[in-house]
Amino acid sequence: CEVFLLVIPLAAYPLREIFHIGKDRRRGQRGTALVCSAAGYLCGFLWSMLTPCSWLVHILFLSYVISIAALLLLNVGFGLRASGHACSTTAPAFLLTWKLHPLFAIPSVLLIAAVYRSSLKLSRHSLPQLLAGSAVSLLACVISIMVYGVR
């Protein structure tokens, strides 16, 4: 599970440096990260379908697959810049809080606030772009829950 959520997406950064992907470093990292994340999440989703996994793992991987498809559509197709970082933190934070314990809301909100603050401070995204990323994530999560049912 961790291979698909962490190792494959993080491989984007060394891959970009080894193969010099993109005209400039930051743009190459963003593109490579998007491709590696999509590959990792899709492989994770397929893995979750082929092996016995918990309901939460199924929801998480389907949410990520829907989210990455929506981000590709919005960011590449329509030229918007919905935040991938906001997207990748919001639904998991919601799921942890909802399914494990309400006290997970505290670190979840702090994590999301840290993502927002760093993106705003570094001028990577505007508040509407961050909110769009979070909205994509929550919508994908709701769709995933509808597919697998509430437990």
Language-model features: locations:
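Selected alpha-helical membrane-embedding segments in polytopic membrane proteins
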Residues: C1-T51
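Membrane-helix interface and helix-disruption motif detector
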Residues: T51-V57
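Membrane-embedded catalytic cores of phosphoryl/pyrophosphoryl-handling enzymes
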Residues: H58-R151
